[in-house]
Amino acid sequence: MKRRQFIASLASATAATALAKTKAVASPLIGIQVAGHSLLDEGMERCLDTIQATCHANAIFLYSHSYYAAHGRAPELYADHGVPIRDERRRKITRVWLRHHPEAFKNTSLAMPEPTDEYGDRDLFAETVEACKKRGLKFYARILEPDTSKLTGRVANFEQGMSVGLDGKISAQPCRNNPQWMAWWDAIVSDTMKSYPLDGFQWGAERMGPLSSVLWKGAIPFCFCEHCETRAKREGINAARARQGFGELHAFITKLHAGVAAPSDGVFTNVMRLLMKFPEVIAWDYQWRVALEEQGQRVFKLVKAERQSAHVGRHFDHQNTSWDAIFLAQWSYADVAPFADFIKPILYHDILAPRLANQLAELKRGPLAELSLPQSLELFYSLRGYDSKLQPKLDELNVRGMDPEYVGIETRRIVDVVQGRCSVVPGIGVDVPNTALEAPNGGKRPSDQLALRAAIKNAFTAGAGGILISREYDEMRLESLKTIGETLKELGQV
């Protein structure tokens, strides 16, 4: 996008959303994330009865496409809602929950298949529109950007829209500079809004950039396709030096992961030395983020073009909101606000603790090798402004959750940054399981009810415009749903 086009789109989008943003702040959004199979397994009316009678949600957030979602969980990780629990691992459930118009995808070779798996014969979006309308519930579509593993065998020609690694092979992420991907993604958004009278559309991309991916995981750097190189040239970035810098950084991290002795002058020093020697690496990584935000700007404009009153939500996952310092530094929430009616940061206090343990272990193998794990944890708490006396110690990360102060601090941080330009609707984690290998208690992590109450209260005290009850309804115990409803009533939010 050229600079003058960007400025023009920014101005028009800001003007177009002033009214919508006022509404978003005035009326608390109490949403709940539901998977399509939950509505059908439990029965639409029964499921909505349960939701309204317990947590008092006023909005249903349903996947339009569940390519990237919580799939393949053991039955023990589902909550008992009074109906038989089916083993999802033995099922082949559709990943498309609505009906598309083929002509919407005329500008891309990525083919949207007809739903043929279990429940593929149901237009669940049409059914949910009617069910929500009768009950006075708002209905929002939600979608997470899929990756290579989720598209394989499901979307024909998807390879033509994916990133290309330094090794010349297809990478996990899509390339947001690739016209094929852009046309496919834009068609999904536009056709979804055109086809159904939705109250809103929430999208997210649970991604790390190329630099974070190398430093955290030792992943092969990306994207070096022709479209990214064209963009780099336009921005004055030397692609050859970016390739060289990423290559040397990847080789260094790979050796560390293989157990090669660290250099005598230190791992962190050598990482910084490479970044200073090759500033093109940081520039290349930044353009990855700019392209991601341009995708968000297109989503906003496409949704508003079809339905001006619809709310556009931006989902940021745990790595985006909490531990990926590079992602957080690249782009301020203030820069996101003009293209969102609300921002939904994942602030799942319970499950963050074991996830954080995994991230610290990965950093220990790479750029933070000189720090002990307790030192890294203390550094994280200090950088994010958390009280280490309240938060779990290293040996507690896998057995208890974060103190709910986490929810309040991160909500307030975003509220202060966006300054009323959009609403902040944090995702409150409810009974989210730990799906890591060898997780304690088989992965079950039932929410502490007092902590759940505190998390909700902290969110609203910090200025939240609502909450999004997360991660998935099928994981939420009735006890937790009732606790949420009672807390919201106590706060006067329902």
Model-derived segments and spans:
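Aromatic-lined carbohydrate-binding/catalytic grooves of carbohydrate-active enzymes
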Residues: 57-117
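Active-site-adjacent "subsite" loops/lids of carbohydrate-active enzymes
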Residues: 111-114, 140-196
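Catalytic domains of carbohydrate-active enzymes, especially glycoside hydrolases
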Residues: 46-69, 195, 462-466
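Substrate-binding cleft of secreted/luminal carbohydrate-active enzymes
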Residues: 340-354, 400-413, 420-486
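Aromatic-lined carbohydrate-recognition surfaces of secreted/lumenal glycan-active proteins
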Residues: 140-144, 148, 202, 245-250, ...
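N-terminal export signals
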Residues: 5-24
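Active-site clefts of carbohydrate-active enzymes
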Residues: 279, 311-320, 377-398, 410-446
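Aromatic- and acidic-residue-enriched segments that line the glycan-binding/catalytic groove
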Residues: 72-93, 147-169, 206-270, 356-371, ...
